[in-house]
């Protein structure tokens, strides 16, 4: 997420900053529609080639949106009983994916030791400390699978029999993978126009 968000923040007209608290059930649908029509994103909407990653709070509000009516149907579930599905998972052909692991949903990270959001640092000239902008939680991240590709760099599988490792007495299976994400320009004018990010206004200040 952070790699695509960083690229979107470099583009005019393809990023915004909105306080999460300003989203309401009355305006959430309109805000999402405005994002999906930003710049040249309509081209990708028409092709059915956009995915929107949305945080849980906004998904909850969209479910309660006052901009449209909904029909809730009950369905039989395999274990018996009745289930209902109320989540909105598509707008005009754009798939909406709820990001449950919100600790990963920031616009930048410090990868020095694992991955942690960048903490806001205030300038302190007497101690020669430069100011640093903290990470922002992502509200909505939009991308096209036509131009955003995740490429594996390393993909290794290891299998150890009992006695061949020090992690216990059983068999040990290890799967190690490392990937990177690239955002490619379109094939018409060599510009990036298939991504968009909206972030919260609050900077990360540490736990």
Where in this protein do the model-derived segments appear?
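Sequence/fold signature of self-assembling virion shell proteins
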Residues: 1-30, 64-207
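Structured, hydrophobic secondary-structure cores that serve as assembly/anchoring elements
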Residues: 25-75
């Amino acid at each position: 997420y952070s790699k695509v968000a960083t690229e979107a923040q470099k583009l005019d007209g393809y990023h915004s900053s909105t306080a999460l608290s300003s989203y309401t059930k009355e305006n959430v649908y309109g805000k999402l529609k405005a994002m999906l029509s930003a710049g040249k994103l309509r081209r990708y909407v028409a092709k059915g080639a956009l995915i929107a990653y949305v945080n849980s709070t906004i998904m909850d509000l969209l479910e309660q949106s006052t901009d449209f009516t909904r029909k809730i149907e009950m369905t039989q579930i395999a274990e018996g009983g009745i289930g209902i599905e109320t989540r909105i998972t598509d707008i005009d052909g754009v798939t909406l994916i709820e990001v449950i692991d919100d600790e990963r949903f920031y616009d930048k990270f410090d990868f020095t030791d694992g991955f942690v959001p960048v903490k806001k640092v205030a300038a302190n000239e007497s101690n020669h400390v430069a100011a640093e902008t903290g990470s922002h939680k992502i509200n909505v991240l939009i991308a096209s699978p036509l131009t955003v590709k995740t490429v594996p760099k390393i993909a290794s599988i290891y299998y150890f029999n009992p006695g061949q490792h020090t992690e216990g007495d059983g068999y040990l299976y290890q799967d190690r993978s490392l990937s990177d994400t690239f955002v490619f320009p379109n094939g018409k004018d060599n510009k990036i126009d298939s991504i968009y990010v909206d972030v919260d206004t609050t900077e990360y200040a540490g736990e």
